[in-house]
Amino acid sequence: MDAIFLRQVWSGNAAMEKKLEADKTPIGRERLHYFRINAGPWSRLDEDKPFVPGSPEVKPVTGSFYPPGMTSDEFENWIQTLSDSERENAKSYFSVIRLDADKKLKSVPYNEEYKQFLDPAAKCLREAAALTTNESLKSFLEKRAAAFLSNDYYDSDVTWMDIDAPIDVTIGPYETYEDGLFNYKASFEAFVTLKDEAESAKLARFSQYLQEIEDNLPEDPKYRTPKLGSGAAIRVVDEVFASGDGNRGVQTAAYNLPNDERVVKEKGTKRVMLKNVQEAKFNKTLIPISKVVLSPADQKDLSFDAFFTHILSHELMHGLGPQNIVVDGRNTTVRLELKETYSPIEEAKADITALFALQYLMDHNMVDKRLERTLYTTYLASAFRSVRFGLSEAHGKAVALQFNYLSDKGAFNYDAATGHY
């Protein structure tokens, strides 16, 4: 997954990695280390500024999903010349856009573009499937191996939802953050985790409230989903391994997958909470930052439980709200219509709707009201943690949007004399 993702970020990454590996100087070792952290020569925590001499000044918004320098207008003009099925392939999660021998644009499925990596990956998954005695995990590994070869991920995505095993595996093309042009194309990643059965059972109760929250979202009722997908699985796990898009730059604390709207409609989504990662983020990042930005009186209200619960609610809220929509008589999705603005808007939606949902549950005595003060205080402190990701990253941009709006509305105050909020 690392090898594929590296090539998805930028077509020059593989060659640059080899060049850095050949540099045995101390600064060369440091550059290679940071290159691998960022999956490229741009610092994701520093507005994508380049740190390797000779690398492009600007990280390409196209990644390597599209021809270098391609604009959104060029893509839109091209797909207007295609048939419906060809247009669907061009916008697919699982294809790249390339120039053929005659310099004409074409879509190439992932199983062809990344064949040299996916064929051996499929072999490894089949070998792993043969070793496990857990039938649900075995089924997923076998079907995901087949998907790597066929480029049809639907069946294995559905099966992934039903994994019930001590070891939970997520592997394949999922998130679309790296496609800065349209957020159409999925990046490859992998997570191997150990399930925390007790914590998973404790949080499963939140699933029973999702339809009620959906029915009470502050939006025009016509945009509400009258019947959410049947699956609303919540898994609390400890991460033991991550790669590809799951192990670059800022480490994710949780994920809500799959993103394929067909699967979401039928089965819902699975929310995976990486508890050991969240504990590290809270203790090693949020607490130290809070001592700088929050008043001493408010620091007592910070709580890991509030931090963990808001992240859980955030992931649950990704599955709520409009997904499949009709625009000018066309059946489409929110993701396809919002294009490059989708990811930050979706992350902001999940953050704020998470607060709305938890407030709703507290107001209706479904969640302990004592969470209220710690929830909002911890949310504010966490905003300073997340905005460090930068405006070029979806979560960082989403937090900046929220922070500025809430500041304008007087949701919190800044004391210029103390420098605290």
Language model features by range: what are they?
Residues M1-A130, S136-F140:
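N-terminal helix-rich structural modules
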Residues M1-I4, C124, A128-L131, R144-A147, ...:
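Structured segments of extracytoplasmic/periplasmic soluble domains
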Residues A3-I4, Q8-T25, R29, E279-I289, ...:
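Zinc-dependent metallohydrolase catalytic domains
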Residues R87-L105, E112-D119, T170, Y174-A190, ...:
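Short, compositionally biased low-complexity segments
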Residues Y110-S303:
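Contiguous, non-catalytic segments that form substrate-binding/exosite surfaces or channel walls
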Residues A121-C124, L137-F140, F308, L312, ...:
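General structural feature for long, well-ordered alpha-helical segments within catalytic domains
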Residues S313, M317-G321:
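Short active-site segment of divalent metal-dependent hydrolases/proteases
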